[in-house]
Amino acid sequence: MEPKTKKQRSLYIPYAGPVLLEFPLLNKGSAFSMEERRNFNLLGLLPEVVETIEEQAERAWIQYQGFKTEIDKHIYLRNIQDTNETLFYRLVNNHLDEMMPVIYTPTVGAACERFSEIYRRSRGVFISYQNRHNMDDILQNVPNHNIKVIVVTDGERILGLGDQGIGGMGIPIGKLSLYTACGGISPAYTLPVVLDVGTNNQQLLNDPLYMGWRNPRITDDEYYEFVDEFIQAVKQRWPDVLLQFEDFAQKNAMPLLNRYRNEICSFNDDIQGTAAVTVGTLIAASRAAGGQLSEKKIVFLGAGSAGCGIAEMIISQTQREGLSEEAARQKVFMVDRFGLLTDKMPNLLPFQTKLVQKRENLSDWDTDSDVLSLLDVVRNVKPDILIGVSGQTGLFTEEIIREMHKHCPRPIVMPLSNPTSRVEATPQDIIAWTEGNALVATGSPFNPVVWKDKIYPIAQCNNAFIFPGIGLGVIASGASRITDEMLMSASETLAQYSPLVLNGEGLVLPELKDIQKVSRAIAFAVGKMAQQQGVAVKTSAEALQQAIDDNFWQAEYRDYRRTSI
């Protein structure tokens, strides 16, 4: 007889009766068998019929369809998550196309704005500046001893919505839901955290329902000392955890990443995850057009930490394809609200300084303006790729897109700002303005575009294609750090799964139904690169794949056996 795998073995638990029914990680609801109902003091606490998880999921799907607004659907799904996590993930995986935009972007933005209004039940950890001296006690209050992934935010720059205070907790909750749904990381291993350092959002401060610390945000040394206390407490409690920074303001995001990426296994998804999925998309789009990314000229609208992170990763990729660093940098043009970044521009942020163009090289440009606008840049650079990370709607105007198309027969246009209300241009407009010739990928989900009786699928440049696989790869390999090369390997693997590259048609990114397969492949590539980089113990390829399989959690009920506490 073959020995049982870990997933086939019974789970021994000490909880029973109503306490067990109130434990989301263990609750099965109507799926508890009659034997389990007897053994765990559940007789009479549930209806008579014993259901399968699929029968439960079908009922939940019918109930879900009864809600008319996206925010009501979000609230309903969160209620299931807080009641029965296994059922929640079975339901979400059964309807991922429909539900991913509801549990994460764009609907999670509204959920963050209304967090205190729709609050039902606590999930995760809320660490207030007022409680900074109790940091160790707070983390010891977390009942899960084997936390492997933490997503933390301070709520200051939530999507394109700005300061949402503790309402930003919706982002770590949603992000970790995707780690599980897409990357197979057990929900028992995940922990959402919000650092409550106050808020400068006057609307929240005036809201009688607001549940956070009613105080202006702490800044400077006080802020960084508080974050450091948190990091040190995390290292003490879970020294091998993967820590993801999420939706920190531009002024803090890069400094925190640079400060801690070599101290704790950590990364910033807004900077590195967005960069990795964007580069993967661009590699695939370039190959589909029969070329390489290094042959393309690229213009960015938005030169914050996310935009500059993408630009630096593009430069690294084009160097891998054979360009010198100088040549690679000359092909990338960054535009912010003050115009094109040049070496003559004052008050540049540290991460912007290497991405400037030399003003002396622009003397022959067709413009009379000292401030070089996006239109000026597009007209003179004649780019192949236009990327929007501005967080401002409508900035890719018809004039700009038509000017780009005039010089590029197959432009790649990527309005990546989210939520949907912040997108630089809609796919419908971009397709129309380029006579159906643009390849479009967006940051938020959009339906296929119908233009002149032809259907154009719109790929969502969704970080969920990257970060779950990175997380799984880190856990499976035991990586102690996340290196740039590990991120590049994730991008390259994502590009290999592009239907447009594989089949010559379809989306430039894989379909959501394939996301678990893609996450497993990315996990293997990331784990292998971690071993090559010396941040994980070397094993055979077979052993790494086995570790990935062993760590991949499925939304299925296990048999329970009773044990004492």
UniProtKB/Swiss-Prot annotation:
Coiled-coil ranges per UniProt: none
Pfam assignment, any one: Malic_M
Residues annotated for NAD(+) binding in this entry: R157, D270, N418
Co-factor(s): Mg(2+); Mn(2+)
E.C. number(s) listed in UniProt: 1.1.1.38
Family: Belongs to the malic enzymes family.
Full protein name: NAD-dependent malic enzyme
Organism this protein belongs to: Escherichia coli O139:H28 (strain E24377A / ETEC)
Gene it is expressed from: maeA
